[in-house]
A protein has these predicted regions:
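Core dinuclear metal-dependent hydrolase active-site scaffold
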Residues: 1-50, 113-196, 253-298
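A structural micro-motif
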Residues: 2, 50, 75-78, 107, ...
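Hydrophobic/aromatic beta-strand patches that form the interior of the parallel beta-sheet core
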Residues: 5-7, 25, 56, 81, ...
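Active-site metal-binding motif and surrounding structural segment of the metallo-beta-lactamase
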Residues: 25, 33-87, 191-207, 218-225
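Active-site-proximal beta-strand/loop segments in catalytic clefts of secreted hydrolases
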Residues: 28-30, 58-60, 83-85, 113-115, ...
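Internal alpha/beta domain cores that form substrate/cofactor-binding pockets in large enzymes
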Residues: 63, 89-94, 102-109, 175, ...
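Conserved glycine-bearing catalytic or ligand-binding loops at nucleotide- and phosphate-handling centers
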Residues: 91-129
Length: 298
């Protein structure tokens, strides 16, 4: 069984994957004072039987590293994955300082297009792979190098984000884009080896400024796009695609087993259910409302 969780964090991003193998992956961190203990307790509980834990940080925007110091102080992060960068900020918060400390430490593994690592995407006799692969960045690409320089100069680090996939035999395929911007994605759309996916977590929390170009979506052919928690007036609702909007769904949990992904949301009154989800009797998850299941080929 695999569980993918997208936390409702009030305009930020934070996810985890509880793998079917001996792995636990966190993607980004957005923890506020009011939710810090509940998130910490959930992470500890869900990861307690996993030997390998990693945190993948897409980029050091505040809404992707908020609460990182708290998390690091209270939860073991032995493996910190990020794009190699020298991002700077005029306002050096405690969380940004912690990001830089982890980024520049011996805990860091710098991710790039096609990289491999035990047990991110390699198996051995000890444990299986996580199924995490990095589709971007190409470290020699001119647009990416310009984005690195912008981040080093203290400008927006949005376009240093990696493109991450989760895909493993007999499980669902999902994409994360961090906060990549539309213009940047248009520039690299022919530089990425796109694969079809069941789920896409929309770039930049679903904002129009990060709308994934149609040419990319046509290659990915997502069955469901999850739109994040940007202000509603800034969202692109991806007309023509089935979507779940986190502003109203709140926490989203996807439980994958036996070629079926069961979708649960924490808002019991969520009504806008994707048409391609089918209801299967007997699906339950404590504290959540079941909204339907998606069949996939694995």
């Amino acid at each position: 069984m695999v569980k993918i969780k997208s936390f409702s964090t009030n305009n930020g991003d934070m996810f985890y994957i509880k793998h079917g193998s001996d792995n636990f992956t966190i993607i980004d961190c957005c923890i506020d004072e009011e939710n810090k203990n509940s998130i910490l307790n959930e992470l500890k509980n869900e990861s307690k039987n996993k030997s390998i834990t990693r945190l993948i940080s897409t980029h050091p925007d505040d809404d992707h590293i908020r609460g990182l110091k708290f998390l690091s102080d209270n939860f073991s992060i032995p493996n910190f994955y990020c794009v190699k960068n020298e991002a700077t900020k005029e306002d050096k918060t405690d969380d940004f300082k912690k990001y830089c400390e982890l980024r520049d430490s011996d805990k860091a593994f710098y991710i790039y297009k096609g990289c491999s690592r035990k047990w991110m995407n390699q198996s051995d006799d000890t444990r299986g792979s996580s199924g995490i692969n990095i589709k971007w960045p190409d470290r020699s690409n001119a647009d990416f190098l310009n984005a690195l320089q912008d981040a080093k100069n203290g400008d927006s680090p949005n376009n240093i984000c990696p493109i991450i996939t989760y895909s493993l035999d007999n499980s669902i395929t999902a994409y994360w884009f961090g906060d990549l911007e539309t213009d940047f994605m248009n520039n690299i759309k022919d530089k990425v080896d796109w694969i079809k996916a069941d789920i896409v977590f929309a770039s930049h929390h679903g904002r129009s400024s990060g709308r994934i170009p149609n040419e990319i979506l046509e290659k990915i052919k997502p069955k469901i796009i999850i739109i994040g928690e940007a202000p509603s007036e800034n969202l692109d609702y991806y007309t023509g695609y089935e979507t779940i909007t986190q502003n109203t769904a709140k926490d989203i949990a996807i439980v994958c087993e036996d070629n079926t992904a069961d979708f649960f949301v924490s808002n019991a009154n969520y009504k806008t259910v994707p048409a391609n989800l089918k209801m299967i009797y007997g699906k339950n998850l404590d504290g959540y409302t079941y909204i339907g299941s998606l069949e996939y080929n694995g």
